[in-house]
UniProtKB/Swiss-Prot annotation:
This enzyme's EC code(s): 5.1.1.1
Keyword Isomerase: yes
Identification of the protein by name: Alanine racemase
Superkingdom of origin: Bacteria
Signal peptide: none
Gene Ontology cellular-component annotations: cytosol
One GO BP annotation of this record: D-alanine biosynthetic process
Gene3D superfamilies: Alanine racemase, Lyase, Ornithine Decarboxylase, Chain A, domain 1
Family annotation (Pfam families): Ala_racemase_C, Ala_racemase_N
Amino acid sequence: MNLLTTRIDLDAIAHNTRLLKNRVGAAKLMAVVKADGYNHGMDRVAPVMAANGADAFGVATIAEALALRATGITTPILCWIWSPEQDWAAAVEAGIDLAVISPRHARVLVDAPPTSRAIRVSVKVDTALHRSGVDEQDWDAVFTLLRDCGHIEVTGLFTHLSCADEPGNPETDHQAETFRRAIDRARALGLEVPENHLCNSPATLTRPDLHMDMVRPGVALYGLEPIPGLDHGLRPAMTWAGAITVVKPIRKGEGTSYGLTWRAEADGFVAVVPAGYADGVPRAAQDHLRVHVNGHDYPQVGRVCMDQFVIFLGDNPHGVTAGDEAVIFGGTGMSATELADALATINYEVICRPTGRTVRDYTGEGK
């Protein structure tokens, strides 16, 4: 028995992958599995995505890319956060595509001695986010440098949208216009760029006019709606739950947890859930959690501790007892989006939180 578990529904992963693939028509689907598959377990979810329509995969780091390749994934893998000081040649030997995210990165690859296989790259152009990416004033130099290098194969260009989760924000169209200008400039200089992509999850779902050659969704694959208030039929794949360890009485006026910041307004019972800030429950979650036990919701009370938090059961009319499952989010509990709203954050962060002593349990067959 595990005291703290994230249940990952592989059938939900399969459903979401198919749904996205069906929405994008002829465009390819690059499934983003960075951060260990958004904390769902990259080694388990990536094969399901591959079997249900993913044409390629995107990760952040070289270590993630190599780990993904080691699972047996044979489709293209793009890595977009790396340093020239790393052993990037190991990624090339493993057939990993590297993102050119600055002129320096381009120069390092061009000046490198030939490897046993061509270095495959995708050029990330900065179209407004002002993060990683080649700035417009450097396009000509970088495009020409790559064009003239015999041991580099350019797969295309990509960029990242800053405001796609805000439908109607003109910045998305401004970025798309800049991106098209980058594609046109590359081709005018004689650089072949066959596969170009800019759509993240919200743009994949709401901007079919921007699908281009490939889309690059992330959070939607895991069943979370990237645009507040919309419903695209996605199925959340993660449920985070703990097994109650203690149920005990509390008298009116008595407090619980550090500082006794909460006191019972009437006699009743409290229960202890074995999840704390060491496991990803933020200390700031105090008084924001509604925990689901046996078909009923109960408020979290008092301060969140390192290893546990407390819920108030009232007079415990439903007979909650030690060993019962307490759902923190997902499944029958609060959705990740509801919890994110309560914590003034985003659902992306919420699903990345279960860590520490949390054990993953997989359900479904990925079909």
